Amino acid sequence: MAKTLMIQGTASNVGKSLLTTGLCRLYSRRGLKVAPFKAQNMALNSFITPQGREVGRAQAVQAAAAGTPLRAEMNPVLLKPLGDSLSRVILLGKPWKTLRAAEYYRERPFLWSAVTGALESLAPDFDLIIVEGAGSPAEINLKADEIVNMRVARHLNAPVLLAGDIDRGGVFAFLYGTMELLEPEERALIRGFIINNFRGDPSLLRPGLEMLKNLTGGRPTVGVVPHLRDLRLAREDSLFLDEGGMGTPKPGLVDIAVLRLPGMTNYDDFDPLAAEPGVNLRFIDSPAELGPGSTLPRALILPGTETPLRALGWLRERNLAAAVAACRDLGVSVAGIGEGFRMMGSFVRGVSGEGAPESPAGQAEPPGQVDLPGQVHLPGLGLLPMEGRFDPEEGKRLLRGLTREGDEVRGYGVPGGWVPAPGDEAPSDGSAPGPMPEAGSGKAPPGAPPAPEAFLVLEGSRAGGLRSADGRVWGAALHGVFDAPGFRRRWLRSLGWTESGSPRDREELQRREFDRLADHLEAHLDMGLLDRIIGI
């Protein structure tokens, strides 16, 4: 059976995920079969297993670091926040229920059985399971119902390392205070501390480390981990934006602006663009950030979102829908990924309950279509002649396909999710399906430009994306299209980008970053002590 180690933290965003990732890499390099595990994750950034199950992106990164295939059991409960205390619950990789906080807590006994079952499934297949906690184990108002911190540690009898981020200030108070708020049997599981994200001379910490050891019954600090600069690994949700993802145009660079939609998912879709020399990637949430005509971005991107109907309302409330249309008319390329692609349609159809407005009074319904109970039908952005469809129960899966230019793309998403606008022919053969509607309104003006073509065909001959005849407006159903260097660079060249060097292999870059992180931890943790704590 597998040995276990658990990483808990004094608060959110103290580095638990990165520490878990680095340790997965470090021990897998020693020849151990390592699995990451997080009982419950709350995140909009997700990934799909080879079996088509959805898990948190952090666990996907950790599994890649460990060199093991991703499994739904590594993150049995994924909460995708929708706002207003409402979350979509993904259970063992499949959509389960949409619940409010009080409803969720009533389901904890059932969810705990899923957590323990997942651990039982993983244990025979691995030598070491590295478990990540969530937030703090000392949230005394939540402890009675938690299924992700000390309850997991007690179930596994796992040794726990408690991590604190010294860059936040007050790290010794955080560590000691957390210990004091734990029950005696919980404190007994804490075997040591990690001080993360240190900048400066570690010798200055010695008096504090000694006092912490004395105050906590001789528990050692397993390591003081210095800040690691420019680590290029996928992060959870808005942390990237909080740490500088918002920016301004930079002279001499191809400027690409991503609309920061409510419920935005898959931030790492755009990492390959940001990594290209000569590209400035930024996130915006107001028309003012687009700048006057001479400083408009070369491209706007509508990303994926867990709440697409709400995002449409948000775009209109902020006048961003009109701004996108105006930018398109001024020659700015407009692209959509996943749900962002489906929002580009003449109309969108979805299920009420995510905070979307009802269908506007007097809004014309497409001929022959009747809304089912609980559905809403709204005008889309009108950038492409299709109807986007959103179903919270829809299943995402791994997808691959070819563009018309022969570029192979791989990723994941909903293979359907859209149909040609009523009266148009299906564009699966790339033929013109009808006039392009007026951007932002859902209406098709007379004399509209030539209609789009299906530029991406998925396995099974299903169209996976549309683009306008001039190529400036396009959308793709799958996340991960920018990982394909041929497709990515072809599009960047159309924006005026000058190619510099050969395309970067994202998987190779990721492997190097995993090793850099593992080397960093190996150099700054007491590995002999850590091995003894784990029992290996």
Segments from the language model and where they lie:
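A conserved active-site-flanking secondary-structure segment within enzyme catalytic domains
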Residues: 345-362, 371-420, 499
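Extended, hydrophobic alpha-helical segments
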Residues: 315, 322, 328, 353-357, ...
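Flexible phosphate-sensing "switch/lid" loops adjacent to ATP/NTP-binding sites
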Residues: 2-326, 333, 392, 403-430, ...
